[in-house]
């Protein structure tokens, strides 16, 4: 018997193929039946739709706020357990400002609101920000897995929504009235909306010359890059009532399709 496996897990897709073929003969009078058994995995396919413009931070002044909306839909065949958000950046320009550090510029921006389940229902919407979290720490935690930044974020974002990978889960969890809508299931049909509010800190501190300390950021600009990773539920011991007549595991389209500990 030969067996090959190929497993590919990515931000929004998964594929697993395994085929088993068996057959044999015996004696002069026999009846040979050959069956091919094919096991094919489902797919994780997350559609992230941005409901507002790209997040370009330029020509802003201290005190300004901007709002970003995201919508997630499940275009795959497996229920999505988490949608993990990571932050990166690109295209930083000093533009004549005395500050030349993109991370220092990120530290001037705070996430003041991160609303999960904005569409409502099942105990949501819920703001998971406990205290203002700056973009520098979110970047260092999610992109660099920085331990110090992670410790700070634990006090600023509801720990239930923090993943061990250093990313923030922005999908609904622990629904109060309809747990079948936790995550982003395929069945029943669902979508999740997330709203984020970012504010340019208004620091009134002045230096010894009487100049605002934030003057060094004048002219700076940066582009924020958000990425979203869909994850599956844990493994499930398949029972007869989990499949249809063709062997399709319909149970895996649902939230909480995993063995209970």
Curated annotation (Swiss-Prot):
Protein name from the UniProt record: Major biofilm matrix component
Chief location bin: secreted
GO cellular component annotations of the record: extracellular region
Renumbered residue ranges of the record's region Disordered: 241-261
Induction record: Part of the tapA-sipW-tasA operon. Expression is directly repressed by the DNA-binding protein master regulator of biofilm formation SinR and activated by the extracellular matrix regulatory protein RemA. Also positively regulated by the sporulation transcription factors sigma H and Spo0A and repressed by the transition phase regulatory protein AbrB, probably indirectly.
Keyword Disulfide bond listed: no
GO terms assigned for molecular function: identical protein binding
Family the entry assigns: Belongs to the peptidase M73 family.
Record's signal peptide: 1-27
The organism's place on the tree of life at top rank: Bacteria
Quaternary structure annotation from Swiss-Prot or TrEMBL: Forms fibers. Fibers have variable length and are 10-15 nm width. Interacts with obg (AC P20964) in pull-down experiments.
Alphabetical list of InterPro entries matching this protein: Peptidase_M73_camelysin, Signal_pept_SipW-depend-type
Transmembrane segments: none
This protein's UniProt keywords: Secreted, Signal, Sporulation
Subcellular location: Secreted; Forespore intermembrane space
Disruption phenotype: Mutation impairs colony surface architecture. Mutant forms pellicles with less extracellular material. Deletion of the gene results in the production of asymmetric spores that accumulate misassembled material in one pole and have a greatly expanded undercoat and an altered outer coat structure.
Function text: TasA is the major protein component of the biofilm extracellular matrix. It forms amyloid fibers that bind cells together in the biofilm. Exhibits an antibacterial activity against a variety of Gram-positive and Gram-negative bacteria. In laboratory strains, is also involved in proper spore coat assembly.
GO biological process, one term: sporulation resulting in formation of a cellular spore
Pfam families assigned to the protein according to its UniProt record, in alphabetical order: Peptidase_M73
Cell membrane found in the keyword field: no
């Amino acid at each position: 018997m030969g067996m090959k496996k190929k497993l590919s897990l990515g931000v929004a897709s998964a594929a697993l193929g395994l085929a088993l073929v068996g057959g044999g003969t015996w004696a002069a009078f026999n009846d040979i039946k050959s069956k091919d058994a094919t096991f094919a995995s489902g797919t994780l396919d997350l559609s992230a739709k941005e409901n507002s413009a790209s997040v370009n931070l330029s020509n802003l002044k201290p005190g300004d706020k901007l709002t970003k909306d995201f919508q997630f839909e499940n275009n795959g065949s497996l229920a999505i357990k988490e949608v993990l958000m990571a932050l990166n950046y690109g295209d930083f320009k000093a533009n004549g400002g005395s500050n030349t550090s993109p991370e220092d510029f990120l530290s001037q921006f705070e996430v003041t609101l991160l609303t999960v389940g904005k569409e409502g229902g099942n105990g949501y919407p819920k703001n998971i920000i406990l205290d203002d979290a700056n973009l520098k720490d979110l970047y260092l935690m999610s992109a660099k897995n920085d331990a110090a930044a992670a410790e700070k974020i634990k006090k600023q974002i509801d720990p239930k929504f923090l993943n061990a990978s250093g990313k923030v889960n922005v999908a609904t969890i622990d629904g109060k009235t309809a747990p079948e809508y936790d995550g982003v299931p395929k069945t029943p049909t669902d979508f999740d909306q997330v709203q984020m509010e970012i504010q340019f800190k208004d620091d009134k501190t002045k230096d010894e010359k009487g100049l605002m300390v934030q003057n060094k950021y004048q002219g700076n600009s940066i582009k924020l890059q958000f990425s979203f990773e869909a994850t599956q539920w844990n493994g499930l011991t398949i029972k007869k009532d989990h499949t249809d007549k063709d062997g399709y595991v319909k149970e895996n389209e649902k939230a909480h399709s995993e063995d209970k500990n």
